[in-house]
Amino acid sequence: VLRGRQFFHRTRKASLEFALEMIRKAIEVDPEYAEARVGAAYTAALLRMYYSTLEGALEEADVESRRALELEPDSSDAHAARGFVLFLQGEMEAAEESFSRAMQLDPLQFESRYLLGRIRFQQGRHLEAANLFDEAGSAREDYQAAFFGAQAREALGSAEDAKAHYRAALEVAERHMDLNPDDPRAATMRAVSLCRLGRLEEGKEWAERALEIDPADAGVRYNVACLFALEQETERAIDCLEEAIAAGFGNRAWIRQDPDLASLKDNPRFEELVSGVGGAGC
């Protein structure tokens, strides 16, 4: 299960599917193994979040998160996993209750803070989101929490504070990629951080690297769209965003709050594209 959970912290479809397969085997050996149920819930939920057209993943996550809580009602990880599923189901109030319970049980529980930060960002509550991403990063170094903390500050209009956090996010992404050189999501967040810091050519290089690693990944396409939008390459940005949505990216609330896409907001093609997107994943 530990090995499987190492894979579900990555976002490539193949890695997530491999992780889920390993965890399912652990459940077959011991159906009462609560940690395995938590791992299955997280992994299936991540598959649904990043690949929204995938059938059956959210249903599996729902079943596994419920079973994990039945087995370990005082497990912070089980409550966080349940909150994750509720978040993807659009049950925001219930999700927040689950995350709050997870944080009460474990002051250093990462996922509850990170995912609640995602909810707050989508709601436009950027200061709360920034604080939650900071707390998540204090619980465990994570390039996504660091990057989204910088983004939340950008959305607040705190340019200098955002720049300092992009520098920190870049360092975290670099350390992560020293150990995981084939992580395309980290490569795209590294690329956008570089662009935000004025290092445009380096940013483009890392965006190209991400596309080489996994050209079909929805999250990679989305973040490359962000990079093009930052460079005022509007049509290329919208092309990439269109490809991301076709590949399964389906989070309208996130797209509308993302400061990296601000230059696209008045474009009719962008508005038409976003109006047809739904879901909770990003």
Residue spans for each PLM region:
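Acidic, Ser/Thr-rich low-complexity linear motifs
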Residues: 53, 178-183, 253-260
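Sterile Alpha Motif
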Residues: 217-247
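Acidic, proline/glycine-rich low-complexity intrinsically disordered segments
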Residues: 1-156, 161-165, 169-175, 182, ...
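Terminal, low-structured helical/coil segments at or just beyond the last alpha-helical repeat
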Residues: 253-282
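Hydrophobic, well-ordered secondary-structure elements that form the walls
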Residues: 191, 225, 237, 264, ...
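Alpha-helical adaptor scaffolds
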Residues: 46, 80-87, 118, 184-212, ...
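Solenoid-like repeat scaffolds
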Residues: 104, 135-140, 174-179, 209-215, ...
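TPR/TPR-like (Sel1-like) alpha-helical repeat modules
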Residues: 166-170, 238-249, 278
